[in-house]
Amino acid sequence: MTFFESELSAKKRDQRRGFLFILSSPSGAGKSTLSRLLLKDAQLERSVSVTTRQRRPSEVDGFHYHFVSKQEFECKRDGDEFIEWAEVHGNYYGTLRKSVENALSAGRDILFDIDYQGTEQLQKKMPGDTVSIFILPPSMKELILRLHRRAEDSQDIINLRLKNAQTEMQHWRFYDYVVINKDLNQSASLIKSIYLAETARRKRCSFLESFVDGLIDEKIN
């Protein structure tokens, strides 16, 4: 464990404000898989979005998403309960404001798996608290293969995702980092490195002032 990883222990986390670590990509570029790999060995908590999308057989309500009706979603939206929300592929997605604010205040870092619309909202509302990465496929041919390989969507849905991918990829320049996902393990390693580097930013580490003062005052025999 590195110095800054150890400083992110439960003892130190309450001494700094957390941040939002955002991954975006067109469907099939590997965003969800990379998110799962990152959560295994990085000190991140996953943001669980609220959605009106139909639950897939492999998904668990409350873990992958909070699945709600369109009426329930609109009620929460109109009540200003979302810090960000968007309509993607004909479905609503949103992030509950209270859960995010509580996590950041407690010094916890939150992983977001959201599209460019949600990212833009978070960047505007919380500019000092966001770190964003856009994930690109190595080619459109590979993107098509991945969508078919997933075997969880109908052909009509796949066609819609491919059409929307062209719009989504135009927003890459508004992100802090861009990763071309040619190799899953290499991409995961790169993204973890970006996360660890961001935890070491001086502005995030309020404990450093007292730590350095202690070093300076420490007696040398």
UniProtKB/Swiss-Prot annotation:
Chain positions recorded as ATP binding sites: 25-32
Keywords: ATP-binding, Cytoplasm, Kinase, Nucleotide-binding, Transferase
Compartment(s) of residence: Cytoplasm
Pfam (any one): Guanylate_kin
Gene Ontology cellular component terms for the protein in this record: cytosol
Superkingdom, natural source: Bacteria
UniProt EC number: 2.7.4.8
Domain Guanylate kinase-like: residue ranges: 18-196
Gene Ontology molecular function: any one: ATP binding
PROSITE patterns: GUANYLATE_KINASE_1, GUANYLATE_KINASE_2
Catalytic activity: GMP + ATP = GDP + ADP
Biological role stated in the UniProt entry: Essential for recycling GMP and indirectly, cGMP.
Protein family membership: Belongs to the guanylate kinase family.
Protein name according to UniProt: Guanylate kinase
Organism of provenance: Bartonella quintana (strain Toulouse) (Rochalimaea quintana)
Source lineage: Bacteria, Pseudomonadati, Pseudomonadota, Alphaproteobacteria, Hyphomicrobiales
